Amino acid sequence: ADLGIDFLAAGIGNIHGKYPANWKGLSFETLDAIQQLTGDMPLVLHGGTGIPTDMIKKAIDLGVSKINVNTECQLSFAEATRKYIEEGKDQQGKGYDPRKLLAPGFDAIKATVKEKMEIFGSVGKA
């Protein structure tokens, strides 16, 4: 269908942020219906953080081509930075230098993105 858009991000049970313990999962029935109506239009899954890998892979099989996992990146950054400070590394030498203080968080985001690229099957693709 020609909707005049390049990507479609529809709600199929996904949310931004952390998922509650009683989350019911993605609605693949809804995703399939959307894919049937939109044809080859690339679909986006917002709120990818915390969605089980098997659901992510099924969503990809049903046409999702972009998955947002910003919350997961932020959480990994915060955890690594917190650990750096809790270990007192910011008090050693010039550990307070923002380049040193923020480096563990940067590395954590990079590791998270690499892991997600593997899961999403996007390694080696432009």
Positions of PLM-derived features:
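Short, surface-exposed, polar/charged, turn-prone segments marking secondary-structure boundaries
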Residues: 1, 35-39, 71-74, 94-98
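Hydrophobic faces of well-ordered beta-strands that scaffold small-molecule active sites
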Residues: 8-10, 43-47, 65-69
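A hydrophobic, small-residue-rich beta->alpha segment in the mid-to-C-terminal subdomain
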Residues: 63-91
